[in-house]
Amino acid sequence: MDGLTSIGTAPWSREQITHAVSTFEALYQTRPIQDNSGGMKSPHMFATWFMAKHLSPSVIVESGIFKGQSTWLLEQACPDAKIISIDLNLSQREYVSERATYFDRDFADIDWSGIDTSSALAFFDDHQNAYSRLQLCKWFGFRHVIFEDNYPATQGDCYSIKQAFSGAGFEPLGSGRHKETAGQKLARKLNLLPTLTPQYNRVQISPNQHDAAALRRNVEVYSEFPPLFKRDETRWGDKWTGTKYATPEPVLPATAKDNHTVFWEEALAYTWICYVMLKG
């Protein structure tokens, strides 16, 4: 499964992606937060803008706001959409939208019965367990989901969909983290509501094929958005090879780097952002 980058057919073509680059490049120059250190850079901002614009949902839920750049971006992509922005810490915002509705609660703790979740878009940039988030989306009726943090096996600070498909499990970085308990393992395998476990407690997930099998039963489309550029090395300093880090072909060839300097400089900010459409 290490080579998996897609399942099903994405609702856009590579040609459409390529043709949108120049429009986004002009938009990117107008971003309100020029230095978004710690947040999204051009590879994922382009991906998010393009996918949201193409899906054109009437409601967008974004989990994880940080400085607020993503809120602005979603406004540009879908000017008529209702945007619901949630983050446990709203104090970091530098851009505050007059259109968005803000909540300082977790995605799991909000009543979503007031919106048509089946046509809404859920955008996650909260560095949480993506497999558990997708379970919640299934329970709440969301079908269209974007995960900004989609790290490959052995990398990153959260359990990603890419890792789940690979069967590699997840090993938290740092100290003071907990191994997955027997109850948490059972809840995950039975697809039980992940709010049965603490939301912001990163646990070790042993290598397994259960999660990949459950994803295949419930996912209609899984599509990793291509990077704008692909460098020789990853952000972690090792070789960016297809064997270790399966990646869609980049949108732009390396020979075009002088014409897109910022995109080339920020190429290492790419972490396999993906779109997921759940089966209805």
Question: Where in this protein do the model-derived segments appear?
Answer:
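A short alpha-helical cap/connector motif
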Residues: 1-122, 128-280
